[in-house]
UniProtKB/Swiss-Prot annotation:
Presence of keyword ATP-binding: yes
Compartments reported by the entry: Nucleus
UniProt KW keywords: Activator, ATP-binding, Chromatin regulator, DNA damage, DNA repair, Helicase, Hydrolase, Nucleotide-binding, Nucleus, Transcription, Transcription regulation
Enzyme Commission number(s) from the entry: 3.6.4.12
Organism field: Schizosaccharomyces pombe (strain 972 / ATCC 24843) (Fission yeast)
Alphabetized InterPro entries for the sequence: AAA+_ATPase (IPR003593), P-loop_NTPase (IPR027417), RuvB-like (IPR027238), RuvB-like_C (IPR041048), RuvBL1/2_DNA/RNA_bd_dom (IPR042487), TIP49_P-loop (IPR010339)
Encoding gene per record: rvb1
One of the record's GO cellular component terms: Ino80 complex
The name this protein goes by in its record: RuvB-like helicase 1
Substrates-to-products reaction catalysed: ATP + H2O = ADP + phosphate + H(+)
């Protein structure tokens, strides 16, 4: 009997994360929203407010402004920020960070903030390039007497024939391009393109007219290019200002032994100077004026903003008012608390009032029991877990008593317990067993209180 077996692909399954079920804000065309949409349950006012913010970002009328998501733990502040990122699409830069990220022994706090600011500002560069593209029909190097004397001869120029469906052209190329042709191992029958401005050569592949040839080396066969040999191509590149900073702060190169040793050693984080950033800003502004580039203000999301200190907040006041600035979204789950870095100055959300005045504040509300039930239903579907109505009710009650995060974290352990019992569906007894194994924050605190005499 012939044995046939299926080969499993080696591609990894997408990891299920806390916000895997969030697909967007779930708004209608008129900007209003229903209670269920885009993976969200409830928070209608907050989602509608985020919809308006998204429209302002898309129309580029919201640069250098700030938004604060204020609400209790587990009310969907991070989910709203991720939904805004998904609504904006992959072309708009979105840079998430946590307030405690700025504290480092290598670079200053303000430098870490500015790095993330620059990561959240995109630059779309449009460049029109003249290229010669086609199948190589001939490649003849022309030799001449060596101008430096001696017996050897040098290559004065190269005659290159290129063919497309529309016609053929013979080009007379510089000897430096011949070196590039040799480096790319170009031969007759290859499809190549040459940039007219830089002389860069790129071998696309072998022409499909030669596909019947027997070759030991695996070749990529490509069709003969359409259109003329000489054509203009518009190339669009998306970069962030931080990419430009890094490229200029750490230029690669140097063939001496010290340069090579420096590359082998563990690189220390480079602090980019304000002078360098100023020079890059000048070049960027020049490109924007010439119409070569377009500035795309993205979104910087700072979670747990109360972890920043008074120095960072003072710096943020200045950074928000600069000409090149992204949209900054803050999130905090604190009420009235002491501003970090001060001894007795208290402020709402741990943010100084002068910065709070500059922000639009969006409030997120705690979830009701029915909303927790609906969220659990969506999460169970994402994680491929089958829950009965009784189990959903039980978990929703548990969620309103403890927290939404706790019951979401229970879903996977409960499904494992049910499978150990040989059940496909999760039962109430599985939830109770899981409850006994894993404590929530309140029960854990009670245990610590009752055993304070034993635990030191």
């Amino acid at each position: 009997m012939v044995q046939i077996s299926e080969v499993k692909g080696n591609g990894r399954d997408n990891r299920i994360t806390t916000h895997s079920h969030i697909k967007g804000l779930g708004l209608k065309e008129d900007g209003t929203c229903e209670s269920v949409g885009g993976g969200f349950i409830g928070q209608e006012k907050a989602r509608e407010a985020c919809g308006i913010i998204t429209d302002l970002i898309k129309s580029k009328k919201f640069g250098g402004k700030g938004v604060l998501f204020a609400g209790g733990a587990g009310t969907g502040k991070t989910a709203l920020a991720l939904a805004i990122a998904q609504e904006l699409g992959p072309k708009v830069p979105f840079c998430p960070m946590v307030g405690s990220e700025v504290y480092s022994s290598e670079i200053k706090k303000t430098e870490a903030l500015m790095e993330n600011f620059r990561r959240a500002i995109g630059l779309r560069v449009k460049e029109t390039k003249e290229v010669y593209e086609g199948e190589v029909t001939e490649m003849v190097p022309e030799e001449a007497e060596n101008p430096l004397g001696g017996y050897g001869k040098t290559i004065s120029h190269v005659l290159l024939g290129l063919k497309t469906h529309k016609g053929t052209k013979q080009l007379k190329l510089d000897p430096s391009i011949y070196e590039s042709l040799q480096r790319e191992q170009v031969s007759t029958g290859d499809v190549i393109y040459i940039e007219a401005n830089t002389g860069a050569v790129k071998r696309v592949g072998r022409s499909d007219a030669y596909a019947t040839e027997f070759d030991l080396e695996a070749e990529e066969y490509v069709p003969m290019p359409k259109g003329e040999v000489h054509k203009r191509k518009e190339i669009v590149q998306d970069v962030t200002l931080h990419d430009l900073d890094i490229a200029n702060a750490r230029p690669q190169g140097g063939q001496d032994i010290m340069s090579m040793m420096g590359q082998l050693m563990k690189p220390k984080k480079t602090e980019i100077t304000d002078k360098l950033r100023g020079e890059i800003n000048k070049v960027v502004n020049k490109y924007i004026e010439q119409g070569i580039a377009e500035l795309i203000p993205g979104v910087l999301f700072i979670d747990e903003v109360h972890m920043l200190d008074i120095e960072c907040f003072t710096y943020l006041n200045q950074a928000l008012e600069s000409t090149i600035s992204p949209i900054v979204i803050f999130a905090s789950n604190r009420g009235i608390c002491t501003i970090r870095g001060t001894e007795d100055i208290q402020a709402p959300h741990g943010i100084p009032t002068d910065l709070l005045d500059r922000l639009l504040i969006v409030r997120t509300l705690p979830y009701s029991e029915s909303e927790i039930r609906s969220i659990l239903q969506i999460r169970a579907k994402v994680e491929n877990i089958i829950l009965t109505d009784e189990c959903l009710d039980k978990l929703a009650q548990e969620g309103s008593r403890t927290s939404l995060r706790y019951v979401i974290q229970l879903l996977t352990p409960v499904s494992i317990i049910a499978s150990l019992h040989g059940n496909k569906e999760i039962g109430v007894q599985d939830i109770e067993e899981c409850n006994d194994l894993f404590l929530d924050a309140r029960r854990s605190a009670q245990v610590v209180k009752s055993s304070s005499g034993f635990l030191q």
